[in-house]
């Protein structure tokens, strides 16, 4: 019996494809652990991944990139650093609400 196998499409690749379809070209992150599957998906899609020294830096850089270029950007952090990214997310959200 001849079986053809198709490679499994992982969640990180699905996330990356969905965001790339929405125009995301840059991802700001503190690479490692939880984020790696998504980062692999973004790199496979040709998205530029910028590794940052801290989660808050990643958030502010994603916000600044979006303000300057008017293109969407992503801040991708793991659960252990989520609280560090909250100030940047709140600033981005507040600037849109003004």
Region roles according to the model:
Residues 1-98:
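N-terminal alpha/beta PP-like core and its mobile active-site loop of ThDP/TPP-dependent enzymes
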């Amino acid at each position: 019996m001849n079986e053809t196998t198709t490679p499994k499409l992982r969640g990180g690749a699905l996330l990356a494809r969905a965001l790339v379809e929405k125009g995301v070209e840059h991802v700001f992150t503190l690479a490692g652990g939880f984020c790696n599957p998504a980062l692999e998906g973004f790199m496979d899609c040709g998205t530029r991944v910028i590794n940052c020294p801290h989660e808050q830096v990643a958030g502010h850089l994603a916000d600044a990139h979006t303000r300057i270029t008017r293109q969407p950007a992503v801040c991708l952090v793991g659960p252990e650093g989520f609280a560090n990214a909250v100030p940047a997310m709140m600033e981005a959200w507040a600037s849109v609400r003004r």
